[in-house]
């Protein structure tokens, strides 16, 4: 949405008259209109987000999710909205499959393709967990960043290895989310159990 707004502003500016522009020109009126529309949409989005946070802040699952590094209010709301009750998944592998983060290999006869993410699950949930993982590895010290650093330690410049590391972090984020909700305990850094 922001990209579209910026693209519209850019196109308006590109087709407008160069400086100096008369204060009552059509180009300036159009620019102000687009800018006002963008500000209005941002204000509406903020109101919706604030209301959603106010409604869910007392929910125990919401509080548990926000204890995980990288998961803020919007990511927690998205996870709860897209996944529903995570306790319905008996094992974290079922939740990974629901997210589309399970590994799949294409096979036919004797041919065996590469193993990669199936991506058959919920794309919004997968994207949210991916973004939460990105934020978590940017924070100071936590198990997500530690795993990412270990993963790319062999070759820091290898983009393919980085992409695999990001996928591994997103899958770890999904497992952590499932475990925390299932057991009802807040996130504990570097706890493997």
Regions found by a protein language model. Name each.
Residues 1-193:
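A detector of single, family-specific signature residues
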């Amino acid at each position: 949405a922001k990209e579209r707004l910026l693209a519209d502003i850019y196109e308006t500016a590109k087709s407008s008259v160069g400086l100096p522009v008369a204060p009552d020109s059509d180009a300036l009126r159009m620019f102000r209109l687009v800018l006002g529309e963008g500000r209005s949409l941002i204000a509406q989005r903020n109101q919706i987000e604030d209301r959603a946070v106010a409604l869910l802040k007392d929910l125990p699952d919401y509080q548990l999710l926000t204890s995980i590094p990288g998961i803020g209010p919007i990511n927690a709301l998205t996870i709860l909205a897209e996944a529903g009750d995570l306790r319905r998944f008996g094992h974290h592998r079922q939740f990974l499959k629901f997210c589309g983060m399970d590994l799949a290999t294409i096979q036919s006869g004797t041919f065996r393709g590469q193993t990669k993410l199936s991506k058959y699950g919920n794309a919004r949930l997968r994207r949210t967990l991916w973004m939460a993982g990105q934020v978590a590895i940017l924070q100071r010290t936590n198990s997500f960043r530690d795993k990412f650093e270990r993963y790319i330690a062999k070759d820091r410049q290898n983009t393919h290895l980085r992409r695999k590391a990001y996928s591994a972090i997103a899958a770890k984020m999904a497992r952590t989310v499932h475990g925390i909700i299932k057991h009802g305990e807040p996130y504990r850094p570097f706890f493997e159990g």
